[in-house]
Amino acid sequence: LPFSVNAELRRAFNEGRVRYTDLNLSDNACQLRQGITGQMDWGIVEACHLERIEGGMVRVYLTAGIGIAPTIFRLAREGVFVELNAWHGHHLMGIHDIYEIEDPWFRSPVLITHPMEKIGRPYVEVPAYRIRGIVHTDLPDEARSMTAPTEVTRRIGANVAEFLRWNMQRGYIYRDKLILQSGVGSGANAVLGALGDSPDVPNFHIYTEVLQEEPLRLIREGRVVSASTGALTISSEHLKEVYQNMDEYRGRLLLRPSEISNCPEIIARLGICSLNTALEVDIYGHVNSTKVCGSRMMNGVGGSADFTNNAMLSIFTCASTAKNGCISSIVPFCSHVDHTEHYVDAIATEYGVADLRGLCATERAEALIAIAHPDYRPILRAYYDLARRNGGHTPHNLRAAFAMHDTYLRKGDMRLTCWEEYL
């Protein structure tokens, strides 16, 4: 299980009741096919329609999330149970592009050169004997509604919009070829909405792993030209609205398996600008996007590394503080690292954008301290001055590197950090 937003599962991960392996989404299906994660006995796949055809085959039309369904149908040793969910109706038929990547070695290229280019079929075709049972349901999806944008997320969105405008002005991004990816969560949803509302950002395409509520609004308004995704992660009310107005989305919306939506080869070829959310960023540009204080799992890395490592321009966004200001999102040293400095191009908070491209370690530190919350800038500056006494290309004081985290765990507020305690 490489990614989950379920609160009960998150508790189980952190309590050790469920063994959880954090994995890039692009690798999940391939590792299953190679047998690295063991044998799959049974599979459960949701569908909106089944069509029996000649030769003892069945066409399975999937619903709003594809994941690794094609691989499950092929690999489940005992077979697959299909949940035939009438709630979805037949609205999504024709929206999918189902294709399984060849396994190594010397596999063929995945020839997608445009976000809406199709290379597969709109269904999964399987032998009828592989379907061991059909369960009829009529249940809406369980995804929650996004929280409303805040002043902080609007400011972050405005800063990212200005940063994109600056890049387009200099020819680093072509206005007529802007393709965005956006990560999961209310913050990412709000930032993408702010970009869509900005006059500085031209109409754009989306190629991403998950599509949330704001991109669908932008499709209706014509700001998003097309959107390719692996899943529609929206509330049942919003999904019902999509189904009722499917003609507005057909031809502009495409659903793919996760190994295609997150395929590094395609991401690099399309020249995507990635937008993902950071839990914390250290002063040299490393990003933690999964573990609170280095230990407690949030949701998993998902596809953020797939996009960050292969995007033409990779941006991470975060509010400068959390927990009513008691936690700084910019710290001396990340308590866990998911994305190293080598792949992180820019960090955006409500106080600005730190463009890290072409900067040495000390220049990165200056740029990132400048966009930290004002309450934390002197604290971070004090650490940086302390670390520089040790010299080196990337100055650190290992006794003090996690002092802000330690102070929060002991006193409940990073602002109470006293560097003298760590000398």
Where are these regions (language model features)?
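Conserved alpha/beta enzyme-core scaffold
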Residues: 1-423
